[in-house]
């Protein structure tokens, strides 16, 4: 709701530079939206209003979508680090909110990450799960082994991106004065554990 007061509103008033990066699942990211990240208190944003996979189309501050080539979590962190480095150069405290698109169906992964999960149990190949197709956007049934392999590959890429963020915070001497808060909004579908 546009009338909500966010942490970004409060920290901006306290002198923080506030940025949002990744999945903005609160409303549209276009400039005219009353709930885009800027309207909700962020000075800068590089965001998409839904999940994203490879080559994500991000809007920079409400502009037309621009495709950032590569794996979505890596592109999200690259933009986040640019923002943090700029805040460091300005000697300004910052709030960098990162909402990854991963892990999220229909799932996809980089070949190097998929290869890590080539040896999942064969019995998973006999079971199927229903999820959205990357090709058609429609619901389809796929082997659980294939789906888990892609899901785990997305988690691996996201983990690598978080590691890149942590490493860069240390290199910038910001680690000791920065709070990292991680939570997720995409639990496993119930059929995975059965």
Regions found by a protein language model. Give the residues of each.
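His/Cys-centered metal/cofactor-coordination and adjacent catalytic loops
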Residues: 1-8, 26-28
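Conserved dinucleotide-binding and phosphotransfer motif residues
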Residues: 13-14
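Residue-level detector of anion-binding/catalytic polar loops
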Residues: 17
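Extracellular polysaccharide-degrading/modifying enzymes targeting complex plant/algal/animal polysaccharides
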Residues: 20
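Metal-dependent catalytic neighborhoods of phosphoester/phosphodiester hydrolases
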Residues: 30-34
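Active-site-proximal cap/lid insertion segments
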Residues: 35-36, 45-194
